[in-house]
């Protein structure tokens, strides 16, 4: 009897430690915002094909003595031209995580609760992503957060991540920062100046500002987008610092 009670207490303690913090904001089983009581912004960069922002982004982060989180696909990790940049990010203390091996679309845009991949296909792609990260010293233990490709997922994807020992995270909606990849010939094109103004307007008009925000940007974009938002990163960080914010890796405090 005593052993049973002890076991129950241990399991309850472990569950409490592993449960998401109540201050986190969840959507479809994924964390989409950190602690809303802290003036902390989590800069998140994703990459699949392009890395043209690497020099600018890393230099700006260094200038601000800030750390960020970088979620790359397996294809990105395997690209020889990106190896040096990835190692530099790791060396400078930034978070490296997964973003799908082949940048799969998990669910239809028009019917999010459906699936375009089976559980087996998803887990196989996930393992391949982490296999590509291993040469850089990145494992599930060192990098337990996963950001879904296309930033599009549902409850099933979140649950499969959890079953694989990972926590799904995604950008905080509201600012449109994730549109920094769009190109002029597309109908959804968002100029960098408009994105910049939306971020600051959101901060000023909401009670919790950008507290706990996972602010997603892209590590590089298509050559057709010459108006690169990462060229505004220094100004954005400077302004947010003036407003009392600090920057940390994903969900670090």
Functional labels for PLM-detected ranges:
Residues 188-202:
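A polyampholytic, Gly/Pro-enriched intrinsically disordered region
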Residues 199-251:
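Catalytic grooves of carbohydrate-active enzymes
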Residues 40-41, 62-190, 208-221:
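Metal-dependent polysaccharide deacetylase catalytic core of the NodB/CE4 family, i.e.
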Residues 58, 130, 134, 158, ...:
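Non-transmembrane alpha-helical segments in soluble domains
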Residues 28-30, 82-83, 133, 201-203:
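A generic local structural motif
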Residues 51-52, 79-80, 155, 223-230:
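Loop/helix-junction capping segments adjacent to catalytic residues or to phosphate/diphosphate-binding pockets
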Residues 1-44, 49-65, 83, 193-194, ...:
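N-terminal pre-catalytic segment of deacetylase/amide-hydrolase enzymes
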Residues 52-55, 124-131, 197, 231:
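Short, contiguous clusters of charged residues that form electrostatic/catalytic patches at enzyme active sites
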